């Protein structure tokens, strides 16, 4: 029989201070975006840049090395660690080709490396990917259909229609993950879009 285990929730394991109060300070955000000590986690179509070493880890790039890309992609402040601000930057908008960042790492599907990441790295990547996917799916107001714009360090989108101006916030969708067992066997499933050989619990 399979022994039940408890796996920590990656979304609850982050070590960053999410800097809620600082998100509204545009001057502080602008200064941090250009600060050489700030770090950026690039993503391309939801795939984070992963540094392949002895163990995979997020490939954080100095903000000054990638500052021009902030104008082309969606970005969000993930938080601060001490004096270092950490941002996520989605570079795969509108079918753009993946930029060549091979000197830092490779864009990798999170499911391929998630189970072998350190807990804090998994938390950072899950948070960044979720937030960037939310931006991609909320470019238009659900109330009036007008375009939305990012505000508060990427943690809010606001309708650009002045008659509407509704703020939109990231949400967390509830989900259930289960393992169906019978003796020493387990039922697994897969999606047709997944790479060959990849299976999952239900």
Q: Which residue stretches match the model-derived regions?
A:
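Conserved Nudix-box catalytic region and its N-terminal flanking loop in Nudix hydrolases
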Residues: 19-23, 28, 32-34, 44-71, ...
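Short acidic-hydrophobic surface loop/beta-edge motif
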Residues: 76-81, 157-159, 180
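Short, hydrophobic/proline-enriched secondary-structure or compact coil segments at domain edges
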Residues: 35-47, 86-89
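Cys/His-rich short segments
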Residues: 127-177
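A broadly conserved sequence feature marking short terminus-proximal activation segments
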Residues: 66-137
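Short, Gly/Pro- and small/polar-rich lid/capping loops
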Residues: 1-29
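Beta-strand-connecting loop/turn residues
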Residues: 83-84, 155, 184-185
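Residue-level detector of short, conserved catalytic/binding motifs and their immediate flanks
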Residues: 38-39, 76, 176
């Amino acid at each position: 029989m399979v022994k039940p285990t408890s796996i920590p929730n990656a979304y609850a394991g982050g070590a960053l201070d999410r800097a809620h109060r600082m998100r509204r300070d545009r001057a502080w955000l602008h200064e941090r975006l250009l600060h050489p000590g700030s770090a950026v986690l690039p993503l391309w179509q939801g795939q984070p840049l992963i540094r392949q070493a002895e163990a995979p880890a997020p490939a954080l790039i100095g903000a000054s090395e990638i500052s021009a890309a902030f104008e082309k992609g969606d970005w969000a402040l993930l938080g601060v660690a001490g004096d270092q601000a950490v941002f996520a930057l989605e570079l795969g908008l509108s079918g753009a080709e993946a930029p060549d960042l091979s000197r830092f790492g490779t864009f990798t599907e999170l499911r391929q490396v998630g189970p072998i990441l350190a807990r804090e790295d998994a938390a950072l990547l899950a948070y960044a990917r979720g937030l960037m996917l939310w931006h991609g799916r909320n470019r238009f107001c659900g109330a009036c259909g007008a375009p939305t714009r990012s505000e508060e360090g990427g943690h809010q989108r606001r309708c650009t229609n002045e008659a509407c101006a509704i703020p939109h916030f990231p949400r967390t969708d509830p989900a259930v993950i289960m393992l169906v067992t019978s003796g020493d066997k387990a039922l697994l499933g897969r999606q047709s879009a997944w790479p060959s050989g990849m299976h999952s619990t239900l």
